[in-house]
């Protein structure tokens, strides 16, 4: 297979027929957060909210959010594709359709979705399509998956605001996918809180240098 064919394969979403079959049972993973000891899969305190962010390699993205005051817990996983219960190796082939994502569970009385979105937009490049820097493939695409209509509206308004800011600097267009949250498949144990376990590990986050003009009124 030529380099061009390999690139095309990794950057095109697979059809249902092309996607890997996956498996019926979830892959083994952690139940508690390595940094704060809180439950990765709930239950979480009443009134707390969730959002899924994809912004390239999930190692650095997860660390970014677990450090935010008001964020209760984070976890990494795969979402937005076809293959049920995929492994990391399967996801990297581009034949699952999933993006690497970070689940962020937060207390909206302490940190707002707008504040989380500001971090999301400023800490990666949302104009790169099916890649993030040197990381190439559908798994590294920019995504926001929300759990209710109000949050989706907030996310879409923030995309519009940041798109205008980027255009003012000659950048864009934004390729970030904003959708209702699909099923999250938790990643393997060694990926959870990876940079806490491996402080010198790879972190590919790099923004555009353009500030995001939010928070917006909710």
Swiss-Prot record:
<feature type="region of interest" description="Disordered">
    <location>
        <begin position="1"/>
        <end position="28"/>
    </location>
</feature>
<feature type="active site">
    <location>
        <position position="57"/>
    </location>
</feature>
<dbReference type="InterPro" id="IPR036509">
    <property type="entry name" value="Met_Sox_Rdtase_MsrA_sf"/>
</dbReference>
<dbReference type="Pfam" id="PF01625">
    <property type="entry name" value="PMSR"/>
</dbReference>
<dbReference type="GO" id="GO:0036456">
    <property type="term" value="F:L-methionine-(S)-S-oxide reductase activity"/>
</dbReference>
<dbReference type="GO" id="GO:0036211">
    <property type="term" value="P:protein modification process"/>
</dbReference>
<dbReference type="GO" id="GO:0008113">
    <property type="term" value="F:peptide-methionine (S)-S-oxide reductase activity"/>
</dbReference>
<dbReference type="InterPro" id="IPR002569">
    <property type="entry name" value="Met_Sox_Rdtase_MsrA_dom"/>
</dbReference>
<protein>
    <recommendedName>
        <fullName>Peptide methionine sulfoxide reductase MsrA</fullName>
        <ecNumber>1.8.4.11</ecNumber>
    </recommendedName>
</protein>
<dbReference type="InterPro" id="IPR050162">
    <property type="entry name" value="MsrA_MetSO_reductase"/>
</dbReference>
<keyword id="KW-0560">Oxidoreductase</keyword>
<comment type="similarity">
    <text>Belongs to the MsrA Met sulfoxide reductase family.</text>
</comment>
<dbReference type="GO" id="GO:0034599">
    <property type="term" value="P:cellular response to oxidative stress"/>
</dbReference>
<comment type="function">
    <text>Has an important function as a repair enzyme for proteins that have been inactivated by oxidation. Catalyzes the reversible oxidation-reduction of methionine sulfoxide in proteins to methionine.</text>
</comment>
<dbReference type="GO" id="GO:0005737">
    <property type="term" value="C:cytoplasm"/>
</dbReference>
């Amino acid at each position: 297979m030529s380099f061009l064919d390999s690139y095309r394969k990794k950057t095109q979403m697979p059809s249902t027929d092309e996607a890997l079959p996956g498996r019926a049972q979830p892959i083994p993973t952690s139940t508690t957060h390595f940094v704060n000891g809180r439950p990765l899969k709930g239950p979480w305190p009443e009134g707390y909210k969730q959002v899924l962010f994809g912004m390239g390699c999930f190692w650095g993205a997860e660390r970014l959010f677990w450090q935010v005051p008001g964020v209760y817990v984070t976890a990494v996983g795969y979402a937005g594709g076809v293959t049920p219960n995929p492994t990391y190796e399967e996801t990297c082939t581009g034949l699952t359709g999933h993006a690497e994502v970070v689940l962020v569970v937060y207390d909206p009385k302490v940190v707002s979705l707008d504040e989380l979105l500001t971090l999301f937009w400023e800490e990666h490049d949302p104009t790169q399509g099916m890649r993030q820097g040197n990381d190439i493939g559908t798994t590294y695409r920019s995504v926001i998956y929300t759990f209710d209509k109000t949050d989706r509206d907030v996310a879409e308004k923030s995309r519009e605001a940041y798109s205008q800011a980027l255009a003012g600097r000659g950048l864009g267009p934004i390729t970030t996918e904003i959708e209702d949250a699909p099923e999250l498949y938790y990643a393997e144990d060694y990926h959870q809180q990876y940079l806490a376990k491996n402080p010198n590990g790879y972190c590919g986050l790099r923004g555009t240098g353009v500030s995001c003009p939010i928070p917006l009124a909710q």
